[in-house]
Amino acid sequence: MAEPVYHRVVVKLSGEYFAGDQSFGIHQPTIDRIAGDLIAAQQLGVEIAVVIGGGNIFRGVEVSTRGVSRPTGDTMGMLATVMNCLALEAAIERRGVSARTLSAFVMPQVCELFTRATAHRYLAEKRIVLLGGGTGNPFFTTDTTAVLRAAEIGAQAVLKATNVDGVYSADPKKDPSAQRFERLTHSQALDGGYKVMDATAFALARDTLLPIIVFSIAEPGSVGAILSGTGRGTIVAG
């Protein structure tokens, strides 16, 4: 078995991906497959934390144009991320692997509050840690949350799961001449305006010296492949 490239990572998953081929909600077969991928990756000897978006349930930035204030809408979206974490936690635990959801919001009847100490302890106990509630503050995306939490818990990289196998010069689904980058610096990613992550996330990763690996989650086993150094993606670092 190949030695993993990283030993502690944050995996960023899109909430929209949880909907599968539906336009809304939770597609259980998709979540079950992701749970299996995360477990297989953990079995490589990697400590795994996960940040999930909430766009399959609610998008605060969209309702802010319909009479709901942006802070309120963002809070609703952050609560949706906790729902996704609980769904993934259940799918992981059905497979006999321990997982824990930690939230940026105090909700003791639902899950524990995120603290660095709690996250460190659960990761050391070989539990998959699911980080819900975003940053706990409006106006910040879950991409930024992933980088922030990675820096807080001492992760060595952020694995950004998307529906394409890296960062391209243009949308490869619209432009067949788009070129995939093997590697970019954080500044190049910012200057290029690539939409795979928001500028705040890239800037924070640059300031905290955190590599971001952008890859496609569509293929089963892709998380483990990235961790073992055999996967296809774009490394954003330096």
Swiss-Prot record:
Phylogenetic lineage: Bacteria, Pseudomonadati, Pseudomonadota, Alphaproteobacteria, Hyphomicrobiales
Coiled coil: none
GO molecular function: ATP binding; UMP kinase activity
Keyword Cytoplasm (UniProt): yes
Binding partners and assembly: Homohexamer.
BP-aspect Gene Ontology terms: 'de novo' CTP biosynthetic process; UDP biosynthetic process
A Pfam family annotated for this UniProt entry: AA_kinase
Activity control note: Inhibited by UTP.
EC main group: transferase
Annotated Gene Ontology cellular component terms: cytosol
Disulphides: none
Residue spans crossing the bilayer: none
Record localization: Cytoplasm
Pathway: Pyrimidine metabolism; CTP biosynthesis via de novo pathway; UDP from UMP (UMPK route): step 1/1
Annotated ATP binding sites: 12-15, 55, 59, 162-163, 168, 171
Family: Belongs to the UMP kinase family.
Entry binding sites for UMP: 54, 74, 135-142
Reaction it catalyzes: UMP + ATP = UDP + ADP
Keywords, comma-separated and alphabetical: ATP-binding, Cytoplasm, Kinase, Nucleotide-binding, Pyrimidine biosynthesis, Transferase
The protein, known as: Uridylate kinase
Family matches, as InterPro entries: AceGlu_kinase-like_sf (IPR036393), Asp/Glu/Uridylate_kinase (IPR001048), Uridylate_kinase (IPR011817), Uridylate_kinase_bac (IPR015963)
EC number(s) given by UniProt: 2.7.4.22
Role according to the record: Catalyzes the reversible phosphorylation of UMP to UDP.
